[in-house]
Amino acid sequence: MTEEFDQTEAERLVDRDMQPGDGRDRALRPLSFSDFVGQKAAIANLKVFVDAARRREEALDHVLLSGPPGLGKTTLAQIVAREMGVGFRATSGPVIAKAGDLAAILTNLEPRDVLFIDEIHRLAPAVEEILYPAMEDFCLDLVIGEGPSARTVRIELPPFTLVGATTRAGLLATPLRDRFGVPVRLEFYDEAELGFIVTRAADKLGIGATPDGAREIARRARGTPRVAGRLLRRVRDFAEAEDADHISEAVADRALKRLEVDAIGLDSLDRRYLRALTESFGGGPVGVETLAAALAEARDALEDVVEPFLIQQGFIQRTPRGRLATGRAWEHLGLVPPQSGQPAAPGGLFGK
């Protein structure tokens, strides 16, 4: 039975952040370093560190995984625990509201266990403070009581490995960042790597994909395995609706066109943004507030969700005067850019 296609405005198919349904196909995730596709340098180094720690029968040094959403940070943390042959506990920064919450988690760890904290940059400062001695000395310093009768109690912890994941490493406090002995930066995947991931996932889903069909999905996946998996599930729905026994290039192309994901991974919101910038404002410069009003979208949604990929792909520039469309944006839309020297487009004087 196929999954029902249901996409709200807040759940874009090409969004790199986790969405409901992304975790349903856990069997598709790699289980070992040898199964993990891409990130060759990072994986090679991690294998050395894990093998060395396992031979010494010590806890692996603390690991910081950073990079854009959807590249496999959670999966990699699970693989580290599995390769070490130890337990795995997972939580996230926003969930740990109080120092006591973290203390409860830490005191229940077994020796050499892996504790994974997603979105570690969102830890509260009070929680970070209790984490410092836990990471460095494997102990907790807790204050019991209040006022003159307050006293400090030190609790010894078993050696453990903290694996932190963040999409915004720059927001980590320096004392916290410095306590990670193994920093790992994950990069976007190339089309060949994503094609391999799609092919393998399609086989596990029981439908199969031709090399051209897998490549058609891969090149629209924004360099992100999570997006590739999401697009594959939707294309599978269309393939089964057409009684196709595999995903061919034609099947994938028809499905993705109906889903309004174009040849390079732009969706309808991306194209609306570019058309507003080029057709309504002459390519800019135009303030993001003006664009948000024209598109009836929140400014934060444009800055955090839409613009990063457009900037990365060279479609727009952020300037002190506002947003500017590049030549590639005009070309992608099939439009002719204005000649240099034309008057500034309306809206260019509005604030960023």
UniProtKB/Swiss-Prot annotation:
GO CC field: cytoplasm; Holliday junction resolvase complex
Residues that, per the record, bind DNA: 299, 318, 323
Region described as Disordered: spans on this chain: 1-25
Biased amino acid composition, Basic and acidic residues: 9-25
Alphabetical GO biological process terms: DNA recombination; DNA repair
Pfam families linked: AAA_lid_4, RuvB_C, RuvB_N
Molecular function (Gene Ontology), one example: ATP binding
Residues annotated to bind Mg(2+): 74
Small ATPAse domain (RuvB-S): annotated span: 190-260
Catalytic activity: ATP + H2O = ADP + phosphate + H(+)
Subunit structure: Homohexamer. Forms an RuvA(8)-RuvB(12)-Holliday junction (HJ) complex. HJ DNA is sandwiched between 2 RuvA tetramers; dsDNA enters through RuvA and exits via RuvB. An RuvB hexamer assembles on each DNA strand where it exits the tetramer. Each RuvB hexamer is contacted by two RuvA subunits (via domain III) on 2 adjacent RuvB subunits; this complex drives branch migration. In the full resolvosome a probable DNA-RuvA(4)-RuvB(12)-RuvC(2) complex forms which resolves the HJ.
Domain statement: Has 3 domains, the large (RuvB-L) and small ATPase (RuvB-S) domains and the C-terminal head (RuvB-H) domain. The head domain binds DNA, while the ATPase domains jointly bind ATP, ADP or are empty depending on the state of the subunit in the translocation cycle. During a single DNA translocation step the structure of each domain remains the same, but their relative positions change.
Protein name, as recorded: Holliday junction branch migration complex subunit RuvB
Organism the protein comes from: Maricaulis maris (strain MCS10)
Phylogenetic placement of the source organism: Bacteria, Pseudomonadati, Pseudomonadota, Alphaproteobacteria, Maricaulales
